């Protein structure tokens, strides 16, 4: 039943204090209050009144330039709204939130296929998820059209064809091979030089352009002019010390050996180890000591080279093959941006004799290495249709198709007519003289493009409490934590009733969250909660910031995910997102942050931070700090809005229409704070900016790339239209401000972090709502608030530790409710 508010009390209060900005003529923040229903019958209405209560409690409304309500008047309104919304929360929670039927997303599709076939699907084979905002697991926001169906059908066919091709191939013995990249490179250079020398000799002997094989006389003169730079440069390269034993990377005038590479044949079922031995060729800036390692077009790691000609450094990385990997190139290049070599060398202040910085001695490969157990597909195919002599083929085919379909449909029995249809397709193909493998392609592709595979189907109970079955709960837990269907161990626990036993459930969840598969929780949930998509999309001018190349961008994104993954595995407190004594970095980020790095390979490692380090937590990462910029300079406004939304659990209001751009309003050099103050003087901007701008200044010691600074350079730094000779000056950074919801001041990063930690209950709620939305595949509603209150209260008693929070979510009845809408 509805909860009815006091019309007389609230109408008078709103008319007196609110309608000027939130009434028929103006709706600041897209909010209108005079038409808000006093009958709270649903979550939307309750949520709107909750927002009113929140801003009144925080003292944000009415604004300072409007008449304030008396203490007694405000006290009565707050008490009435609080009591009414508490009743609404309880009544609405009894009906629960509805979960729309949801499709498995790209990440879940890849991991589900991996479980079925033991094959890794490359991203380029899958259609995009097309999620504008929110989590990619939320059914209401997912789109699926005939375009998606056609793409998934094509992808399924590719997967099945590769799986059938390799399913009965013998597993090869692992071998170690060594490639000397200079052999191919030097052979090419010698041939190139010989051809140039031969032509030049004939020209000197009086041969015409036609006799030499050159287009015309003009091209002949151009050939003579370029002879020394082209042939001479290659000759000089071949004469360099150790050029006959390895390859110098990125040498000027010789693009053919800018990379060290060779081709290898791969088994898509296997994992390989790649190694290379390298040395620093000459004294160059440290920024030029990093290599990028790729397999085909995929970058798989970054390495810092610190070896010498006498003692090279050896680097190794593992690579799990994709199903499209059959013959691919393994190559290493110097890690730098997209600038031309000449521009890049000029930017880094290169003064060495040669342009090359790194010498590669050799490239090595070891493998293939196979998983210990066969995939479901391999095991069941070899037991039925994959035998050397198949007895009773029809029976074996039906047995295989039924077992595969049931596994693909997550232990749900397929409809008899569906199995009959795929079985008849197999029979028809066999009658048309196709092999067993050829006959299986279309039937299995149909299974993998069926709604029962692409959508997570949960049956609604017909009687009693509306909870999912134990098997459905097992899959719900597994897709939540691992982005893949439940394995045999979890399904057996469900069958034994262990998921309803809190002690057994906790043991199961701890094991799952310590397993490597829990990486998908960082990859899927945390990257979306932290809004790392914004970091991916922000444009940084590489010519102005040469250190910020793809290597730093990719590494910084992974750092944020690795921090959360470490918190999950070690059951650390959520406050580690604010302040921690560690971070998780690779060698490239260690250089970027000026930190010591103990592990000399590209794999990420958890490192302890020095006592005085500004790093620590999500807010100390390049990913967070860079997406809190406008691409040219740090932005307290953007950082403040991100902090408010993620860490203080309050979504900033959208800007009013026609709001002016935050831009320089003076010809004089201005600090970021002065620019923001100019913006806040505008009446339409002040009320919102007063709430989150002060937060952003707490991180102002970090520049737009997340590097520490004590001073700010004033002027049109990085602007293309900046006037030459324009004066700039440097002033000390002032990282001070105030927390908007408590008026607690801070005057440096340490005090800012302490203040944010004191608001940890808001971060806990932000993460809790995010995890619940991600895990259930639906938006959080007002009806869910009582459950979230209970979850957060229990998590707080355990110091907001991540695994404890996840346990509280999964054991709560809200996580076990059945879907109610389709």
Model features per residue range: what roles?
Residues 34:
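Short, aromatic/basic-rich helix-turn unit that serves as a nucleic-acid recognition element
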Residues 2-31, 44-60, 64-822:
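Low-complexity, glycine/serine/threonine/alanine-rich intrinsically disordered linker
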């Amino acid at each position: 039943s509805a909860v009815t508010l006091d019309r007389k009390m609230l109408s008078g209060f709103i008319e007196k204090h609110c309608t000027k900005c939130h009434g028929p003529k103006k709706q600041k923040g897209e909010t209108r209050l005079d038409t808000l229903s006093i009958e709270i019958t649903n979550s939307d209405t309750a949520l709107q009144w909750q927002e009113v209560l929140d801003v009144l409690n925080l003292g944000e409304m009415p604004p300072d330039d409007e008449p304030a309500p008396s203490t007694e008047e405000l006290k009565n309104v707050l008490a009435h709204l609080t009591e009414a919304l508490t009743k609404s929360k309880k009544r609405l929670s009894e009906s629960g939130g509805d979960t729309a039927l949801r499709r498995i997303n790209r990440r879940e599709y890849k991991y589900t296929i991996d479980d079925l076939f033991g094959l890794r699907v490359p991203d380029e084979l899958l259609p995009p998820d097309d999620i504008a905002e929110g989590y990619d697991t939320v059914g209401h926001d997912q789109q699926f059209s005939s375009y998606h169906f056609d793409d998934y059908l094509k992808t399924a066919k590719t997967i099945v064809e590769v799986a059938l091709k390799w399913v009965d191939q013998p597993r090869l013995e692992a071998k170690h091979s060594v490639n000397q990249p200079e052999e191919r490179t030097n052979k090419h250079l010698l041939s190139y030089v010989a051809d140039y020398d031969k032509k030049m000799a004939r020209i000197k002997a009086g041969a015409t352009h036609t006799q030499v094989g050159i287009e015309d006389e003009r091209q002949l003169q151009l050939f003579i002019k370029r002879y020394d730079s082209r042939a001479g440069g290659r000759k000089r390269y071949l004469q360099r010390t150790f050029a006959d034993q390895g390859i110098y990377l990125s040498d000027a005038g010789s693009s053919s050996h800018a990379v060290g590479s060779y081709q290898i044949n791969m088994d898509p079922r296997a994992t390989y180890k790649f190694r290379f031995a390298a040395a620093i060729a000459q004294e160059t800036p440290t920024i030029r000591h990093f290599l990028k390692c790729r397999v085909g077009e995929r970058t798989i790691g970054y390495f810092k080279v610190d070896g010498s000609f006498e003692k090279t450094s050896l680097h190794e990385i593992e690579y799990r093959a994709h199903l499209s990997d059959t013959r691919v190139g393994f190559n290493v290049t110097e890690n730098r941006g997209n600038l031309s070599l000449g521009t890049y060398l000029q930017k880094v202040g290169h003064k060495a004799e040669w342009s090359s910085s790194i010498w590669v001695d050799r490239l090595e490969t070891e493998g293939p290495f196979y998983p210990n157990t066969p995939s479901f597909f391999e095991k069941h195919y070899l037991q039925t249709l994959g035998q050397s002599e198949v007895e009773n083929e029809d029976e074996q085919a039906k047995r295989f198709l039924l077992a595969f379909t049931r596994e693909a449909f997550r232990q749900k029995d397929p409809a008899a007519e569906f199995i009959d249809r795929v079985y008849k397709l197999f029979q028809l193909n066999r009658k048309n003289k196709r092999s067993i493998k050829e006959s299986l392609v279309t039937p299995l592709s149909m299974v993998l493009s069926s709604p029962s595979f692409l959508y997570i189907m949960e049956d609604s109970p017909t009687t009693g409490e509306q909870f999912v079955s134990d098997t459905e709960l097992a899959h719900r837990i597994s897709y939540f934590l691992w982005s893949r269907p439940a394995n045999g161990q979890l399904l057996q626990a469900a069958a034994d009733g262990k998921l309803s036993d809190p002690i057994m459930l906790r043991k199961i969840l701890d094991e799952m969250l310590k397993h490597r598969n829990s990486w998908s929780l960082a990859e899927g949930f945390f990257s979306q909660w932290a809004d790392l998509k914004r970091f991916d999309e922000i444009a940084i001018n590489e010519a102005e910031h040469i250190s910020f190349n793809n290597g730093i961008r990719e590494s910084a994104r992974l750092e944020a995910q690795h921090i959360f993954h470490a918190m999950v595995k070690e059951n650390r407190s959520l406050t580690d997102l604010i302040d921690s004594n560690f971070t998780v970095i690779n060698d490239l980020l260690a250089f970027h942050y000026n930190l010591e790095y103990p592990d000399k390979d590209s794999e990420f490692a958890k490192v302890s931070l020095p006592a005085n380090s500004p790093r620590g937590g999500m807010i100390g990462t390049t990913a967070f700090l860079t997406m809190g910029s406008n691409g040219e300079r740090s932005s307290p406004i953007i950082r403040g809005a991100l902090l408010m939304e993620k860490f203080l659990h309050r979504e900033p209001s959208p800007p009013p229409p026609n709001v002016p751009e935050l831009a320089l309003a003076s010809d004089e050099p201005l600090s970021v704070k002065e620019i923001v103050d100019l913006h806040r003087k505008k009446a339409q901007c002040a009320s919102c900016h007063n709430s989150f701008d002060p937060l952003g200044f707490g991180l102002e010691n970090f520049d737009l790339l997340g590097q520490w600074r004590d001073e700010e350079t004033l002027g049109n730094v990085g602007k293309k239209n900046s006037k030459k000779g324009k004066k700039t000056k440097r002033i000390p950074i002032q990282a001070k401000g105030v927390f908007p919801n408590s008026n607690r001041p801070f005057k440096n990063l340490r005090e800012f972090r302490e203040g944010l930690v004191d608001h940890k209950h808001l971060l806990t709620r932000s993460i809790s709502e995010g995890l619940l939305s991600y895990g259930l595949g639906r938006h959080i509603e007002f009806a869910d608030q009582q459950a979230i209150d209970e979850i957060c209260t229990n998590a707080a008693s355990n110091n907001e530790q991540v695994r404890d929070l996840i346990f509280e979510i999964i054991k709560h009845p809200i996580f076990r409710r059945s879907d109610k809408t389709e």
